[in-house]
Amino acid sequence: MTDDFPAAPAGAARDPQTELLHPVTPVQPGFESFSVPTARASTVIFPDLASMRALDWRSDAQWRYGLHATPTSVALQQRIAAIEGGRYALLQPSGLSAISNVYFAFVKAGDDVLVPDNVYSPNREHGDWLAQDFGITVRYYDPMVGSGMAALLRPNTRLIWLEAPGSITMEVPDVPAITALARERGIVTALDNTYSAGLVFKPFEHGVDISVQALTKYQSGGSDVLMGATITADHDLYLAMKRARMRVGLGVSADDCSLVLRGLPSMQVRYRAHERSALAIAGWLKRRPEVAAVLHPAFEDCPGHAYWKRDFTGAGGLFSVVFDPRYTSAQVDAFVEGLELFALGWSWGGAHSIAMPYDIAAMRTAGMWPHRGVLVRFYIGLEHEADLRADIERSLTRHLR
């Protein structure tokens, strides 16, 4: 490669202020790198008025406005869709905004929505808000209902949510049974697939219409980006979500897209590392006398394990522990706060381990929670497994005697 870059062409002298705004900067051709360029834009420049006036919002072959798409965001959308096994993806500012995109695209006043009782709590709060203020009926169902879903369907049911597994209590639903019933009746199904990151569960192979993910988690991997995605294999569903996204004004920054793109090449390696450590630590905790139950999809006694074994090719870094009922909430809180290598905080999917206690009985409305002990969800990060196990053991010994 030559070091002789082409010189800027000579032209009429212009004021420096104008030159700063309208530079002529030839670039040496042939540059390539592993990174997708970061294209920041609000205004998108059109070559002529005819091109501007010919815009069709349904077309993905035309650039419109930086809020809607840039080369950087499109590159990320394409990669997310490919990993998931879909054809179309839309990026949202957060996982919750991706959930909102589905609601706004497919539900209106007078419609009925079914949501699993183990759903991600912001989705529950979103549904309750829509029910209270927008005239939509939202009902919660037992996540293990399977083909029993048929008895719950109404003529105005428009949307069924699924979560596989439940991100706190780890039940794995019979996804194909539910999606088959929905498809027979023209009901849209949307599944929160954040747990699998599109790696170990392929929703479109099991009849799901729309997959929703929080790219905040495994895709980013750094605990420093907020982003979500809606993915589908159906063009009409894609256009409905695209239209709703544009009307609400949802968009993502090119810089955030670049950060997520940077995390994708290592995602599967990280995912498997989380999985190995989580399985080992969950198995060890299962043998501890302080523990009444370990909720991990790979364990035979986890609700829906047979469906996980049939439909999944792995597990992530999440699992939950139900402590023996003899321990009070205060004691379990002290155990969690006594952990040195586990942070307290929302979200997961990054390099650092996290532990959070939950009052599941207070969160359920569709049925009775079968356990009496306090539940703690563990997210196993990339710290060495032996150090994490030693940290848990120290806090167990100190606080749960």
Language model segments and positions:
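PLP-dependent enzyme catalytic core of the Aspartate aminotransferase-like
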Residues: 1-4, 87, 128, 137-139, ...
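Conserved PLP-enzyme active-site core in the AAT-like
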Residues: 2-11, 17-26, 88-288, 295
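N-terminal "arm"/small-domain region of PLP-dependent enzymes with the aminotransferase-like
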Residues: 2-70, 78, 376
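Glycine-rich beta-alpha junction loops
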Residues: 25-27, 40-47, 195, 217, ...
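Conserved N-terminal alpha-helix of the aminotransferase class I/II PLP-enzyme fold
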Residues: 48-97, 122-129
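Short, solvent-exposed beta-strand edge segments and adjacent coil->beta transition regions
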Residues: 60, 225-227, 314-318, 373-377
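Short, well-ordered beta-strand elements within core beta-sheets of diverse protein domains
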Residues: 260-269, 316-325, 377-381
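Conserved small-domain helix->loop->beta segment predominantly found in fold-type I
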Residues: 279-340, 344-349, 360-370
